[in-house]
Curated annotation (Swiss-Prot):
PANTHER family: HEMOGLOBIN FAMILY MEMBER, HEMOGLOBIN SUBUNIT BETA. The modification Phosphoserine is found at residue 44. The gene is HBB. The lineage of its organism: Eukaryota, Metazoa, Chordata, Craniata, Vertebrata. Keywords: Acetylation, Heme, Iron, Metal-binding, Oxygen transport, Phosphoprotein, S-nitrosylation, Transport. This is Hemoglobin subunit beta-A/B. Belongs to the globin family. The keyword Transmembrane does not apply. Heterotetramer of two alpha chains and two beta chains. Red blood cells. Involved in oxygen transport from the lung to the various peripheral tissues.
Length: 146
């Protein structure tokens, strides 16, 4: 696999402490605030007029929760991310035409949110391992483009 045994240990150790539902909503919300052009995929979600509106939007929270639960499932198949995300890749790429760059942006935002939540526990080694994971997931999601 692309992660060492040690890196897998770091990732799983931290992930076990993550409140997936909460962090998912925060990560997707921040994506929409920090990179406003990503909002065009979520026009049906209602009020996205300000940072506060986005962060408290129930549909954003619900989709963020869904996104991070899928990410969580992917971590269980860390050595076959392409297989784990094949269906979601098809949906986002073929049906929704999401630019794969957005998957990378969301991965980077997720890393920021984890750093924010875990402080000292999110040390450089943990960050490096997670950065590999989010890059791997983004590549798996972009797979249908290649």
């Amino acid at each position: 696999g692309f992660l060492t045994a040690e890196e897998k240990g770091l990732v799983n150790g931290l992930w076990g402490k993550v409140n997936v539902d909460e962090v998912g909503g925060e990560a997707l919300g921040r994506l929409l605030v920090v990179y406003p052009w990503t909002q065009r995929f979520f026009e049906s979600f209602g009020d996205l007029s300000s940072a506060d509106a986005i962060m408290s939007n129930a549909k954003v929270k619900a989709h963020g929760k869904k996104v991070l639960n899928s990410f969580s499932d992917g971590l269980k198949n860390i050595d076959d991310l392409k297989g784990a995300f094949a269906k979601l890749s098809e949906l986002h790429c073929d049906k929704l035409h999401v630019d794969p760059e957005n998957f990378r942006l969301l991965g980077n935002v997720l890393v920021c949110v984890l750093a924010h939540h875990f402080g000292h526990d999110f040390n450089p080694q943990v960050q490096a391992a997670f950065q590999k994971v989010v890059a791997g997931v983004a590549n798996a999601l972009a797979h249908k483009y290649h």
